[in-house]
């Protein structure tokens, strides 16, 4: 693969599709209540480069809802965004320290869009992310390859339950 294209395959992403709705668990807060510097720092742990300007614009898009889970000290342990697309809604990013936190954020955001088509793009190596999607009745609709021209970044894939977008990562 690399010899022909100069790209190295890191892993596959899987897009899962389902329907929004359900009960909203308690415990998460609106992203607007989170100090932006903390959000940007948490995001930077899960993406190969700092992206504060992008992130500020991303979470403020029209038709977007973002939630975070905080620990007892007010530190972020997970956050997620769901945004309106041409057809339905897409999660991304969905980053969390544990599968339980990811599930809480997923359920909270899904509850915001009852009856709407929803998509979650998961990195295949995160088996907990794949299980989360399947547990909520989502089905795989297609896959993409995450490729790089240089070194593959050392990202905590076990904490990446939904990529920001296939185009961005």
Regions found by a protein language model. Name each.
Residues 4-90, 100:
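Amide-forming acyltransferase catalytic core, primarily the GNAT-like/NAT-type
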Residues 87-99, 106, 116:
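Conserved acetyl-CoA binding element of GNAT-fold acetyltransferases
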Residues 3-4, 98-111, 131:
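Conserved acetyl-CoA-binding loop-helix of GNAT-fold acetyltransferases
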Residues 64, 114-117:
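Short, high-confidence coil segments that cap the C-terminus of an alpha-helix
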Residues 2-23, 83, 93, 119-169:
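Active-site/acyl-donor-binding loops of N-acyltransferases
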Residues 79-84, 106-112:
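Short, flexible, solvent-exposed loop/turn segments with mixed acidic/basic and small polar residues
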Residues 42-45, 108, 135:
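Residues within well-ordered alpha-helical secondary structure of globular protein domains
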Residues 52, 103, 126-127:
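Structural motif corresponding to alpha-helix initiation and N-cap regions
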């Amino acid at each position: 693969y690399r010899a022909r294209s100069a790209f190295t395959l890191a892993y596959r992403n899987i897009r899962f599709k389902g329907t929004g709705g359900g009960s909203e668990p308690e415990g998460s807060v609106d992203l607007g209540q989170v100090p932006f510097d903390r959000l940007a720092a948490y995001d930077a742990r899960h993406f190969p480069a700092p992206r504060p300007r992008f992130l500020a614009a991303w979470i403020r898009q029209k038709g977007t809802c973002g939630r975070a889970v905080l620990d007892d000290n007010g530190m972020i342990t997970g956050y997620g965004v769901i945004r309106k697309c041409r057809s339905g809604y897409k999660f991304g990013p969905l980053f969390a320290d544990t599968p339980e936190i990811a599930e809480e954020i997923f359920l909270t955001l899904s509850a915001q869009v009852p009856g709407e088509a929803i998509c979650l793009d998961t990195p295949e190596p995160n088996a907990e992310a794949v299980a989360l999607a399947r547990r909520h009745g989502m089905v795989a609709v297609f896959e993409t390859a995450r490729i790089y021209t240089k070194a593959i970044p050392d990202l905590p894939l076990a904490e990446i339950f939904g990529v920001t977008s296939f185009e961005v990562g």
